[in-house]
A protein has these predicted regions:
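Conserved small/polar residues in nucleotide/adenosyl-binding loops
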Residues: 157-164
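Conserved structured catalytic cores and adjacent interaction surfaces
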Residues: 1-127, 136-150, 156
Length: 164
């Protein structure tokens, strides 16, 4: 299981560590004050991870760069964030022909081949994913998709279905 927080922290924990669930639940990750969990992925241990930030930066790295940790561990740095930036989305990549779909608050979307995101080591600065400005607004989401996958976008005023 792979987790990411808005502060750029990532953590990998073996699923077997959650076998002894109780009625009150289990601690999966220790968060700092004002830190939020933004994503959890079930991975095979050999995937690649992409993190996307609100200011248009993304990083792609091997899941194997993160060692498995115990349930109560905090995690390690997945991306080095610029001041005021935060991670808004995380996804795993299982195929090199996948694409990254990035959405902004002004309703714009960008579809980019995963191969255009050079692979870095965990904790790097990342690359420009999408230029953020007044026209685009900040990044609100990112998802790894496959060619031909149907995508539905929903906003407060429109409902659209697109086949990509």
């Amino acid at each position: 299981m792979f987790m990411a927080t808005d502060k750029g922290t990532v953590k990998k924990t073996n699923l077997e560590d959650f076998n002894s669930a109780r009625k009150v639940g289990l601690i999966a990750i220790t968060l700092d004050e004002n830190e939020q969990l933004i994503g959890v992925e079930l991975t095979d241990g050999n995937s690649e991870i992409i993190l996307a930030t609100r200011n248009g930066i993304a990083i792609r790295f091997d899941e194997q760069d993160v060692r498995p940790m115990g349930r109560t561990a905090h995690g390690v740095r997945g991306i080095q964030l610029n001041y005021g930036d935060e991670v808004v989305a995380m996804d795993s990549v299982t195929s090199e022909n996948s694409e990254v779909l990035t959405a902004t608050e002004q309703g714009l979307g960008k579809r980019t081949s995963v191969s255009e995101y050079r692979k870095q080591t965990r904790g790097g600065k990342g690359v420009i994913n999408i230029k953020v400005n007044e026209k685009t607004g900040i990044v609100i989401g990112m998802k790894v998709i496959t060619p031909g996958q149907e995508i539905m976008t929903v906003s407060y005023t429109h409902l659209r279905a697109h086949e990509t």
